[in-house]
């Protein structure tokens, strides 16, 4: 994962209205049957589907920090998953968690959590993951007129001071792919990394590409995307988080697989995250 901030909000809202409405409508009149014996099936609340997102949920994943609207890539996807599981929109309940708390060992107050979590073997020791629903590229964000301007390859990045959110795939990618001359500065949130960039404490930070588009278009004045980073052996596939050994893992994975097979997942992705074309990959 990387977080917060994709495409301009105005364009996103206009492009995705149909998808959001469609996802909610499908959930409201699901062809699936009502979940049977919800308590026995492992749901937190019988007859309800409890979904978690971040303490603050960011665009383009959730619009206006309101996941119940179904607007945003992960909000729309959550309702599409709910529909596949047999839940109407009104039977979906949202809760909030911090990023780290959701992947810590122990019981959960949610049935699943959708918050741009990268699937890793280390995290699998504490929680379950669904089938992946998105593969995210990592991007370098910097200020115009700063040390990163004019950089067009990996060698040009090495002399920069980088920042990233602690524990994120972005931080791992910096060290594994860029291998900068200085130690990567780690922050508790992407907001802190942005503040450090604005203060001149770092030259650039790395974040997932959809978030980079939103950051540069709305949140960081005079900023730009330097380019995408090659994978370098680090996969950044996002999965839904569930409690370890959850009885719901198989059914949630099956729902995502069905959404991929019937084209719904691609439709939602295209509507909300279609700004990723045209950014060069730095080699």
Label the model's feature ranges.
Residues 30, 75, 80-85, 168, ...:
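Extended ligand-binding regions for polar small-molecule ligands
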Residues 23-28:
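C-terminal motif of bacterial Sec signal peptides marking the signal peptidase cleavage site
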Residues 36-113:
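Extracytoplasmic small-molecule ligand-binding "clamshell" domains
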Residues 92-154:
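Acidic, polar ligand-binding/catalytic clefts
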Residues 1-16:
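Bacterial N-terminal signal peptides that target proteins for export
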């Amino acid at each position: 994962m990387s977080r917060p901030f994709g495409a301009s909000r105005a364009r996103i809202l206009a492009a995705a209205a149909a998808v959001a409405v469609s996802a909610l409508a499908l959930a409201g009149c699901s062809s699936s049957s009502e979940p049977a014996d919800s308590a026995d099936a492992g749901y937190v609340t019988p007859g309800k589907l409890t979904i978690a997102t971040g303490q603050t949920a960011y665009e383009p994943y959730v619009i206006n920090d309101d996941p119940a609207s179904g607007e945003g890539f992960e909000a729309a996807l959550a309702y599409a998953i709910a529909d596949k599981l047999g839940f109407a929109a009104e039977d979906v309940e949202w809760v909030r968690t911090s990023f780290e708390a959701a992947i810590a060992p122990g019981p959960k107050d949610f049935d699943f959590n959708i918050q741009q979590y990268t699937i890793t073997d280390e995290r699998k020791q504490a929680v379950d993951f669904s089938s992946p629903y998105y593969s995210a590229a990592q991007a370098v964000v910097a200020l115009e007129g700063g040390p990163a301007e004019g950089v067009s390859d990996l060698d040009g990045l090495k002399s920069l001071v980088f920042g990233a959110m602690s524990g994120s795939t972005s931080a791992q990618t910096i060290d594994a792919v860029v291998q900068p001359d200085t130690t990567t500065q780690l922050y508790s949130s992407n907001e802190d990394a942005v503040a450090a960039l604005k203060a001149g404490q770092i030259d650039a930070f790395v974040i997932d590409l959809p978030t980079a588009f939103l950051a540069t278009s709305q949140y960081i004045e005079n900023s730009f995307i330097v380019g995408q980073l090659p994978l370098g052996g680090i996969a950044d596939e996002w999965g839904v988080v569930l409690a370890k050994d959850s009885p719901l893992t198989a059914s949630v994975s099956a729902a995502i697989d069905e959404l991929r097979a019937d084209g719904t997942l691609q439709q939602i992705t295209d509507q909300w995250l279609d700004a990723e074309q045209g950014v060069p990959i730095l080699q």
